[in-house]
């Protein structure tokens, strides 16, 4: 393949303005790198509803979407159509492309390609709620202990089979961390190359003078486990700032004591400044990689986090002093 003359497509699962996170940041950067070094890729996703400001990242190019885009609430609530996702991603027509690059945490890896096309997939995670996080997902849903729990379990069982099959479709798999690579090996029985996501650490500056507050930056969704952080700080009575938005925000505000404040939409804050001033950065989620903790360390803030997942790739935690090595955080076991 002549890469300089290749026609390229870039596929991500979806772009939902309320839940843009690390996977979307990686996709934006992939688009930038491909556009600067080769030709602008055509963009595909199951659905999109990004804002005009976010749309400028893609130089106002069209994002080709699936049939879910035209269904009621498909743009905003794509996961309501979970049973349709495998079917929908397979309907994207990529026949005219030489190189397909997918950025996948659920479905993008599952696009259909021909033997003469090259498909490289950057895997953020195998489908979480089809594998090791299935029971957690069900417990946090409104369907636990209802008549619909069994149909939900059957759906996840079928999705697990599709996730395994579709994981074998790309020609090359790239994992975002050792943790993700191990999950790919366990669930798909495949090898993968680990390339950590790029993090723009130039945005952040080290500051040795710290103020008396702790910081957590997350999308406020169940798997980030911000509720555990709140419960801990309710007990400790230490000042905590939580930055983020998401469907869990009102629920989390209700359980937070007065020592905890929230910054998000409608509030004036600067993440870079908060990271440069906080005493430490607190993170409770089991991350596939975890961009926010890397940004915190770039600002000189030590990380207090769970010793599982992607944090094991990035946080140096030494219980005993080591020559020429410094700790960048504390990782707790559970």
Q: What label would you give each PLM region?
A:
Residues 250-272:
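Nucleotide-activated donor-binding/catalytic signature segment of Leloir-type glycosyltransferases, i.e.
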Residues 276-288, 301-302:
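Acidic donor-binding loop of glycosyltransferase active sites
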Residues 36-109:
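Active-site donor-binding segments of glycosyltransferases and PAPS-dependent sulfotransferases
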Residues 182, 186, 190-194, 198-212:
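Acidic anion/phosphate-binding donor-loop and adjacent secondary structure
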Residues 199, 205-241:
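Conserved donor-binding/catalytic core segment of Leloir-type glycosyltransferases
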Residues 140-173, 181:
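Membrane-proximal helix-turn-helix segments that form the acceptor-binding/catalytic region
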Residues 302-306, 312-315:
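Short hydrophobic beta-strand element within catalytic cores of glycosyltransferases
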């Amino acid at each position: 393949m002549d890469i300089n003359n290749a026609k390229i497509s870039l596929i991500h699962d979806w772009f939902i303005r309320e839940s843009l996170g690390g996977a979307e940041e990686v996709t934006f950067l992939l688009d930038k790198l491909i556009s600067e070094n080769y030709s602008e890729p055509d963009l595909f996703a199951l659905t999109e509803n990004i804002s005009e400001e976010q749309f400028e990242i893609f130089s106002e190019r069209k994002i080709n979407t699936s049939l879910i885009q035209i269904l009621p609430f498909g743009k905003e609530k794509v996961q309501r159509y979970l049973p349709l996702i495998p079917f929908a991603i397979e309907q994207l027509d990529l026949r005219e492309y030489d190189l397909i690059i997918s950025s996948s945490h659920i479905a993008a890896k599952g696009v259909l390609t021909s033997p003469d096309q090259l498909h490289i997939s950057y895997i953020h995670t195998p489908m979480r709620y089809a594998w090791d996080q299935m029971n957690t997902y069900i417990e946090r849903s409104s369907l636990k202990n209802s008549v619909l729990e069994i149909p939900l379990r059957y759906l996840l069982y079928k999705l697990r089979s599709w996730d395994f099959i579709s994981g074998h479709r790309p020609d090359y798999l790239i994992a975002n961390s050792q943790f993700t690579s191990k999950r790919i090996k366990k669930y798909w029985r495949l090898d993968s190359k680990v390339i950590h996501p790029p993090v723009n650490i130039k945005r952040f500056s080290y500051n040795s003078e710290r103020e008396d507050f702790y910081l957590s930056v997350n999308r406020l969704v169940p798997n980030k486990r911000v509720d555990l952080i709140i419960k801990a700080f309710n007990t400790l009575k230490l000042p905590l700032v939580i930055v983020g938005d998401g469907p869990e925000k009102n629920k989390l505000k209700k359980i937070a004591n007065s020592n905890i404040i929230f910054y998000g939409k409608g509030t004036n804050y600067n993440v870079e400044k908060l990271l440069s001033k906080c005493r430490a950065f607190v993170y409770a989620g089991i991350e596939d990689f975890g961009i926010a903790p890397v940004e915190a360390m770039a600002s000189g803030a030590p990380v207090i986090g769970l010793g599982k997942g992607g944090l094991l790739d990035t946080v140096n935690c030494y219980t005993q002093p080591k020559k020429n090595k410094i700790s960048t955080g504390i990782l707790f076991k559970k």
